[in-house]
C-alpha cells in the first residue's frame, strides 16, 4: 500500500443532539423565509456543505483528519504511509459517507477486492450496477456498506470505494476505513 485518500462526509449528528437540532432549526427557518442565525456550526449547514468539521491547525488540518491519519497508520503498522484525509460537514442528520482511494504497488483486481470485502464480517458489498446510501441502506444497520468498487481511470494500481455506515450504530468514520484493512493487507 502506497497511498490512502479519504474524503468523509459527516452528518450533523457527529456533533450530537445539538447538531441535529441545529440542522432542523435552520431548515425550518429557511423554508419559512426567516433569517438564519448559525449557532453550532458557525455557518449555515442547512442545504449547504462545510469544508471542515472541527478546528484546524496552522497547516489547515482538522483534529479528526489528523486523528484518522495517525490511527490508520498505527492500525496498518505503516508509520510512513501517505494518507490524505478531508472531513466535510454534510447537511444530513445521520449516516457517514466516505470516498476512499487506495494506491498499491501493483495492478489491482477490483473483483477480487470486492469479494474480499464482502467476506469480511460486518461488511456488505453492493453490486457494481447499484450503490448504497447512508439513508437508504445504512440507517439503523450495524453493517458497513461498500459500493462502486473500481480500479482507477488513469492508474491501474488505484482502487476507489464508496463506503456508508450509520454513525450512531457503527461508530466513527475510522470504523468504515478499518473495514478495508483486509483489502489493503491482502490485495494491495
Q: What name fits each language-model region?
A:
Residues 1-115:
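Active-site-lining helix/loop region of Rossmann-like oxidoreductase modules
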